[in-house]
């Protein structure tokens, strides 16, 4: 069996040597941001030493200068990696940028676009400003089914409540969580009992660390590594716990990619080669867990998950590439021969978690809060 598997891996790699990349779809977490405001911080971190700051001039949760630079540099990295596919200049027909309706994500998309497409000589309109405007599309949150099924679908809410019953079992794997929750409660000033509280705390501490602010000594035991990450990571598992949740959170992104592939291969849209979606780390984590490649971690600022379509000898292949904290990983999706997965195998092994009908999986649409679960 091992010999057979190794044979298929060698064959796929051999055929892939002369492969041509045909299309990419990238899901990008927004870049470094300011912390949340004091009124919100008080709800989960009353002892927060920075809760009275207003984060002038950009405001709470908006991109910092460090975040702006990181997003721009991500665009430059993507330019280097995909320059042959995307071509030397920006053309509206060849790429598409879309963002969730949050300014930190919208601005991340604009900055990635700026790094990805510096103006050619014919596109320079101001010699002192090497930049061209590139549109970033967005829809209102209540219409954004790709990013907010968790808050708009009754079936998701039903499954999330069922998943919540598994929290204790997941926490047992980590061990000694009650002492840890007691430690968090003592130092934050709020009673910690659920993974989502640790998840929120992690993101606040990450925002402070990104700004270079001094963290309180008690955080040394839990941040940036340690049990806080392990407990926070449970949230990504809970968000995609059932196959239906996977379809609503991660499978809808797989379907979108496959729809783009179908448009290309059928000739409906042969010009557009790059699709870039600015979102948040929830979506990145959801896609990873839906693909069954997620390992406990918090997707970092500007982390990017990319589906690549390649063609070799009239056969099509998919690669899943993950850029996180300056590391690039090519995943082997379970059921695929290697990180180079034939398109048909990719579809087959992910069939149960690929969105087929949003209306059926979603059920009644409404306004449901994951914080209450």
Where are each of the predicted segments found?
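Cleavable N-terminal signal peptides of Sec/SRP-targeted secreted and luminal proteins
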Residues: 2-19
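Signature for phosphate-centric chemistry
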Residues: 19-96, 100-373
């Amino acid at each position: 069996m091992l010999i057979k598997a190794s044979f298929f891996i060698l064959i796929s790699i051999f055929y892939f040597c002369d492969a041509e990349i045909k299309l990419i779809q990238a899901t990008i977490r927004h870049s470094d941001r300011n912390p949340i405001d004091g009124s919100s911080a008080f709800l989960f971190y009353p002892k927060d030493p920075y809760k009275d700051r207003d984060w002038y001039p950009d405001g709470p949760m908006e991109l910092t200068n460090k975040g702006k630079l990181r997003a721009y540099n991500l665009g430059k990295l993507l330019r280097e990696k995909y320059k042959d596919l995307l071509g030397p200049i920006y053309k509206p027909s060849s790429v598409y940028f879309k963002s969730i309706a949050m300014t930190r994500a919208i601005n991340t998309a604009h900055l990635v676009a700026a790094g990805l497409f510096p103006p050619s000589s014919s596109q320079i309109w101001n010699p002192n400003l090497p930049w061209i405007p590139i549109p970033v599309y967005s829809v209102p949150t209540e219409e954004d089914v790709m990013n907010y099924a968790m808050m708009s679908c009754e079936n998701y809410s039903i499954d999330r409540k069922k998943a919540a019953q598994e929290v204790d079992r997941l926490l047992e794997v980590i061990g000694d969580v009650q002492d840890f929750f007691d430690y968090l409660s003592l130092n934050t000033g709020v009673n910690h009992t659920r993974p989502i509280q640790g998840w929120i705390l992690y993101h606040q501490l990450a925002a402070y660390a990104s700004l270079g602010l001094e963290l309180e000594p008690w955080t040394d035991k839990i941040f940036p590594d340690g049990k806080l990450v392990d407990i926070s990571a449970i949230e990504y598992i809970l968000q995609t716990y059932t196959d239906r949740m996977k379809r609503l959170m991660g499978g809808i992104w797989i379907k979108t990619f496959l729809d783009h592939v179908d448009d290309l291969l059928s000739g409906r849209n042969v010009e557009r080669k790059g699709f870039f979606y600015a979102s948040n780390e929830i979506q990145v984590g959801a896609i990873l867990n839906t693909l069954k490649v997620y390992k406990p971690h918090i997707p970092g600022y500007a982390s990017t998950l990319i589906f690549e379509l390649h063609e070799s000898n009239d056969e099509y292949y998919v690669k899943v590439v993950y850029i996180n904290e300056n590391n690039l990983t090519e995943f082997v999706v379970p059921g695929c021969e290697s990180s180079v997965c034939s398109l048909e195998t990719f579809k087959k092994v992910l069939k149960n978690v690929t969105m087929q009908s949003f209306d059926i999986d979603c059920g009644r649409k409404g306004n449901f809060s994951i914080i209450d679960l």
